[in-house]
UniProtKB/Swiss-Prot annotation:
SUPFAM superfamilies: An anticodon-binding domain of class I aminoacyl-tRNA synthetases, Nucleotidylyl transferase
Cofactor info, note text: Binds 1 zinc ion per subunit.
Lineage, top ranks: Bacteria, Bacillati, Bacillota, Clostridia, Eubacteriales
GO molecular function, one term: ATP binding
UniProt xrefs under InterPro entries: aa-tRNA-synth_I_cd-bd (IPR045462), aa-tRNA-synth_I_codon-bd_sub2 (IPR020751), aa-tRNA-synth_I_CS (IPR001412), aa_tRNA-synth_I_cd-bd_sf (IPR008925), Glu-tRNA-ligase_bac/mito (IPR004527), Glu/Gln-tRNA-synth (IPR000924), Glu/Gln-tRNA-synth_Ib_cat-dom (IPR020058), GluQ/Sye (IPR049940)
Major location (coarse): cytoplasm
Subcellular location: Cytoplasm
Motif ('HIGH' region): 11-21
GO BP terms, alphabetized: glutaminyl-tRNA aminoacylation; glutamyl-tRNA aminoacylation
Protein name: Glutamate--tRNA ligase
GO cellular component labels: cytosol
């Protein structure tokens, strides 16, 4: 391999694309592309019991949707494949046997019952479980005999019990661990497949990975990974361990707890660009005031040394704000195209949806807010006459009734029902009555919508509703106000 930067995203196909996983993929992609490097997709499927049908498609689809295009991977191949761990079984066994020859690993024939007993003892003593090296000194004859008899075995890493192991992480700095704390972790399981802990080290080396990006929960395993690199005489890659993403101060974001996955956020009407932009800022500080970044700007600005150690809190309000910024930056045509499925779901009347898009474009932060903004277009909602009283607009029951009674015949006489003509009629009435705009416009808006807050005002709503429906609703408003007399 050359000195080219090479990063990898190595998910397990176990279901949804969690926000934390997507951030790992994004950071790995940005590190590679910042230096014109390669971004590799590797599928880590050695834990066969956790695999979920269709999860592989979720991984491919997410990378495709987000534009985090990999340069090598199972679907497109590359020079260091296969890129699926279950297809690399023989490679891991070969390297595990090399460790045995070097005296850095050993066969373990301990039964499940014995290991369960050791675990129970550790729990009773409130100590972390560590294998007791029971099989470390078996002779070659004993090992050969047990293998010949078909006794199940695993291959374990042989860690020292004295001294310490140190490693450097770009975010957390230099970390040193007493070797007495290192468990002789399993490298090859009894089914012949490697553990994640072994496979990721072998694959990262053979695939020429220069920067390993992963969650900070792997910090505690890194000394054992380093001992594997040293045992093989391999260079240790640059470690970039990212802080956890928290739901709040005390709870990690977790799909198991019903927290949003990438698919959930997309289904709620968040734009992929906004999601990526927001996730990039969960733990990374670009410096300065700028918060909205295109992918090209992220690639240029991203420096992994500016990732914080402190956990990042997933702030839905901040994500909504950012999504609103992205929605407002869309062209009207693009927004209309994205809003159409929501109109089809929410509207029961045949209305000019392009005009509705003109109203909503700057008024929604998330696309799934659209239906709740449209309810009054289908049917006039039941509302209290008290809505006609508005202190700021200086409206009362009396002047509201007068405004509606005065505007009704003028709108009835209107032959060409357009926004401009409706506006002209209403503004002429304001002059004629010598009142503030709100005295005429607030009652009309209340009558046609039945709501305190609407996208657009009286003219826009009347234009979209059409003449017949608008007049009908104004008459209902007049009746409501007359009933109070």
């Amino acid at each position: 391999m050359t000195n080219k930067v090479r990063t990898r995203f190595a998910p397990s196909p176990t279901g949804y694309m969690h926000v934390g996983n997507l951030r790992t993929a994004l950071y790995a992609y940005l590190i590679a592309k910042h230096d014109n490097g390669d971004f590799i997709l590797r599928i880590e499927d050695t834990d066969q019991e956790r695999l979920v049908e269709g999860a592989l498609d979720v991984i491919y689809n997410t990378l495709k949707i987000t534009g985090l295009s990999h340069d090598e991977g199972p679907d497109i191949g590359g020079p260091v494949g296969p890129y699926v761990q279950s297809e690399r079984r023989n490679i891991y066994i070969e390297y595990a046997e090399k460790l045995i020859e070097k005296g850095e690993a050993y066969y373990c024939f301990c039964s499940k019952e014995r290991l369960d007993m050791l675990r129970a003892n550790s729990e009773a003593l409130k100590r972390p479980f560590r294998y007791d090296k029971h099989c470390i000194d078996l002779s070659k004859e004993e090992i050969d005999k047990k293998i010949a008899e078909g006794v199940p075995y695993v291959i374990r890493q042989k860690n020292p019990t004295t001294g310490s192991t140190s490693f450097h992480d770009e975010i957390y700095g230099d970390i040193s661990v007493d070797n007495s704390e290192l468990d002789d972790m399993i490298l090859i399981k009894s089914d012949g497949l490697p553990t994640y802990n072994f496979a990721n080290v072998v694959d990262d080396h053979l695939m020429g990975i220069t920067h390993v990006v992963r969650g900070s929960e792997y910090l505690s395993s890194s000394p054992k990974y380093n001992r594997l690199y040293e045992a093989f005489g391999w260079d240790v890659p640059i470690y970039v361990h990212c802080p956890p993403i928290m739901k709040d101060e005390h709870h990690k974001l977790s799909k198991r707890n019903g927290d949003a996955s990438f698919e959930d956020l997309m289904a709620k009407g968040y734009l992929k660009e906004a999601i990526l932009n927001y996730i990039a800022l969960l733990g990374w500080n670009p410096g300065g005031e700028k918060e909205v970044f295109s992918m090209e700007e992220l690639i240029e600005a991203f420096n992994y040394r500016n990732i914080n150690k402190a956990p990042a809190v997933f702030d839905t309000k901040k994500l909504k704000w950012m999504n609103g910024e992205y929605i407002r930056a869309l062209s009207l045509d693009k927004f209309h195209e994205m809003a159409l499925p929501y109109y089809e779901e929410a509207l029961t009347r045949d209305l000019d949806t392009k005009k509705i898009s003109e109203l909503l474009h700057t008024r929604v932060e998330v696309l799934n807010e659209i239906p709740e903004q449209l309810d009054f277009f289908n049917n006039l909602l039941e509302y209290s006459p008290e809505m006609y009283i508005h202190k700021k607009m200086k409206t009362t029951y009396e002047n509201s009734l007068k405004s509606l009674e005065e505007v009704l015949p003028k709108l009835e006489a209107l032959e060409n029902w357009t926004f401009e003509n409706i506006k002209e009629v209403c503004m002429n009435l304001v002059k004629e009555l010598e009142v503030k705009n709100g005295v005429v416009l607030w009652p009309i808006r209340t009558a046609v919508s039945g709501k305190q807050f609407t996208p657009g005002g009286a003219f826009e709503i009347a234009d979209i509703l059409g003449k017949e429906e608008t007049l009908e609703r104004i008459k209902i408003g007049i009746d409501k106000l007359k009933a109070l007399q």
